[in-house]
Structure formats: structure tokens, C-alpha cells
């Protein structure tokens, strides 16, 4: 379900949001979901 939220933000927005979450890491679950979402888009 978290993947869907990330997929809604397409293009560079997804990269920016994913990178920001990975760098800041405010919420571990979202951080993992961000990485999974980015790999899902590219993979």
C-alpha cells in the first residue's frame, strides 16, 4: 500500500522524495517503502 503512495509521485518527484526519506530517515518503515518503490519503478 505504501508503494502506491510513492508511485503517485512520478518522475523526478519520486526520486527527490525517496532520496529525502533515505537521507533524513524520519520513519524507518517509509524509508524502506521508499527504497522498495524506487527499485520497483526502475526494476
Curated annotation (Swiss-Prot):
- PTM comment: This sactipeptide undergoes unique processing steps that include proteolytic cleavage after Glu-8, and covalent linkage of the alpha-amino of Asn-9 with the carboxyl of Gly-43 to form a cyclopeptide. Thioether cross-links are formed between cysteines and the alpha-carbons of other amino acids, Cys-12 to Phe-39, Cys-15 to Thr-36, and Cys-21 to Phe-30. In forming these cross-links, Thr-36 and Phe-39 are converted to D-amino acids. Propeptide cleavage and cyclopeptide formation only occur after all 3 thioether cross-links are formed.
In the record, the effect of residue 12 to A is given as: In vitro no longer makes the first thioether cross-link, in vivo no cyclopeptide formed
Report where the covalent cross-link Cyclopeptide (Asn-Gly) sits.
9-43
Q: Does the keyword Secreted apply?
A: yes
For this UniProt record, the keywords arranged alphabetically read as follows: Antibiotic, Antimicrobial, Bacteriocin, D-amino acid, Secreted, Thioether bond
Residues joined by cross-link 2-cysteinyl-L-phenylalanine (Cys-Phe): 21-30
Check the record and name the InterPro entries matching this protein. Subtilosin_A (IPR021539)
Question: According to the record, what induces this protein's expression?
Answer: Transcription is highly induced by oxygen limitation and is under dual and independent control of Spo0A-AbrB and ResDE.
The family assignment reads: Belongs to the bacteriocin class V family.
For this entry, the protein name equals Subtilosin-A
Amino acid at each position: 500500500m505504501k508503494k502506491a503512495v510513492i508511485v503517485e509521485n512520478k518522475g523526478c518527484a519520486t526520486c527527490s522524495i525517496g532520496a529525502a526519506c533515505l537521507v533524513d530517515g524520519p520513519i524507518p518503515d517509509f524509508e524502506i517503502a521508499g527504497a522498495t518503490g524506487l527499485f520497483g519503478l526502475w526494476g
